[in-house]
Amino acid sequence: MLRVAVPNKGALSESASEILSEAGYRRRSDPKDLTVVDPANNVEFFFLRPKDIAIYVGSGELDLGITGRDLAADADAPVRERLALGFGSSTFRYAAPAGQDWQIADLAGRRIATAYPNLVRKDLADKGIDATVIRLDGAVEISIQLGVADVIADIVGSGRTLGLHNLVAFGESLCDSEAILIERADSDPDPARDQLAARVQGVVFGQQYLMLDYDCPRTVLDKATEVTPGLESPTIAPLADPAWVAVRALVPRRDVNAIMDELAAIGAKAILASDIRFCRF
């Protein structure tokens, strides 16, 4: 039976469970459940702390896991990223009190508070900077005010939380994170793992792409297919009027309105975008 780790709480939990449900797997009925067996798919799900998932997968106790790229990196476990899942995006950056033009070189000799000590130590080592890393499990923003640290390293979203504590982010991101599906780094190929990954990838792809259908004059077909090249090639079918063809192609969801504008501008008609629920590629 395939053994899969899922975040039990936090920002990744609900979206991870939703993707697995869309992929045809059983959901837990009670948020307090720590395990769910899905006999129809021969899978057992374990609901664990997101920070621990890479450790369990890296040890080989579990076959796959969903966690954050930042959490997997900080765990320093022998895992590899199988698939990016397209949710839970964030950046991991240094931040310090506003009012000073902070540079990465200013970290030398400083105390840096973080919930991701391994990630920070690796970054400092890569940069050749000697600093003291202080591990805290949360609310690191307050550590500077309390005199525990000079700088923090933490997940940065909108920056609102930093602003509330009069902090400013500086330097490049240590890690551009999102939810990922991981497996043990030295794991051999396995059909059961491949099947779950393919199902999940199909759901993720369906969230990121739309199917676009439109009628196109033959005279501008080359221009239209440049706008909508699809994955390998668009589908083109004749219409009753020989001067027109029907075109179908996958397009990125984020670009669909701009693409529809371009098609309309060159004379395409009846442009229709449709959601994709499930797919395999």
Swiss-Prot record:
Name the catalysed reactions. Answer: 1-(5-phospho-beta-D-ribosyl)-ATP + diphosphate = 5-phospho-alpha-D-ribose 1-diphosphate + ATP
UniProt pathway: Amino-acid biosynthesis; L-histidine biosynthesis; L-histidine from 5-phospho-alpha-D-ribose 1-diphosphate: step 1/9
Q: Which UniProt keywords apply?
A: Amino-acid biosynthesis, ATP-binding, Cytoplasm, Glycosyltransferase, Histidine biosynthesis, Magnesium, Metal-binding, Nucleotide-binding, Transferase
Q: How is its activity regulated?
A: Feedback inhibited by histidine.
A Gene Ontology cellular component where this protein is annotated is: cytoplasm
In terms of InterPro entries, this protein maps to: ATP-PRT_HisG_long, ATP_PRibTrfase_cat, ATP_PRibTrfase_CS, ATP_PRibTrfase_HisG, HisG_C, N-reg_PII-like_a/b, N-reg_PII/ATP_PRibTrfase_C
Known EC number(s)? 2.4.2.17
In which compartments does the protein localize?
Answer: Cytoplasm
* Gene Ontology terms, MF aspect: ATP binding; ATP phosphoribosyltransferase activity; magnesium ion binding
Protein purpose: Catalyzes the condensation of ATP and 5-phosphoribose 1-diphosphate to form N'-(5'-phosphoribosyl)-ATP (PR-ATP). Has a crucial role in the pathway because the rate of histidine biosynthesis seems to be controlled primarily by regulation of HisG enzymatic activity.
Family statement drawn from the similarity comment of this UniProt entry: Belongs to the ATP phosphoribosyltransferase family. Long subfamily.
Protein name in the entry: ATP phosphoribosyltransferase
| Species for this entry | Mycolicibacterium gilvum (strain PYR-GCK) (Mycobacterium gilvum (strain PYR-GCK))
